[in-house]
Amino acid sequence: MFMLALLLANATVTPPSPPLVAPAVIDNSLEITGDSVAAEQLKKRMFIDVKVNDSGPHRFLVDSGADRSVVSDGLASQLKLPVGETVRVQGMAGQREVATVEVAALTIGTSEIGPIMAPALSARHLGADGLIGIDALADQRLMLDFDKRSITVQDSRQPYVATGNEILVTARRRKGQLIITQASVDRREVAAVIDTGSEITLGNSALRRRLFGASKPKDMRDIELLSVTGQVLKAEAIALNNVQIGSLVLSNVVIAFADAPPFALFGLTERPAIFLGSDLLSNFRRVSLDFRNRKVRFTMRPETEQRDFVTRRF
């Protein structure tokens, strides 16, 4: 459960400028097939309508960084879901033991998973009725359309119809998550985890040391982040240029640095690594996550909207 939210928004960092892109990579003709689900954007995160045991729709956060789906304690109480065993939930700020509830079926459009035992977390900390994790996404292709505020769920066993205009990056799967190894920050190689549930991009201490050593740049700011478990994570944030993902080079990217427990979970404490949050992803027009086939596709916005954010390196 790796969702993070900014806790002290008025004392943190200046967000990145609106994104940019080269005309050659603008995709105005991409045909999206599959099950399109209405979504809304609260701040930078994406929410979709989900049915729980045929009840709903209920508003769930889409979190590609979470290994299992979650329901809020309020929704669990409202639907009188049977209580199960207590489990230990790993958040960005630490671990917490929470009760689980039995869910017969979670339905996203025409896709359904269940039965599952879902951790029940505080609705106040989730900011939603629940959270869709990779247990529901493992065989899916997820298209996040930040312009239309919609999410398209597809069966990734079906062939993907490419237009030739998307930027394709191949990822690895580790503990279910997509990890991009073709990434760097200021020419330092990093492992990049796609995390749609986090509002901010997070770097580990190994990356901070590689970039700055023991010094603290004058424009680096102390911030606090709130995890879905309700715990607070202290971090340092700074805007950086020359962040590369595949052939894409991003500028003015805000990265918060902290020793978050999930880095250890993925074996990424010693190697420089980042979690790519929705603050970064939402600067693109569309982002497609294909979990089965380990593919991430980025579609740009018009050049006039992304002039100072993204360029391509051939």
Q: What residue ranges belong to the model's regions?
A:
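Pepsin/retropepsin-fold aspartyl endopeptidases
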Residues: F2-F314
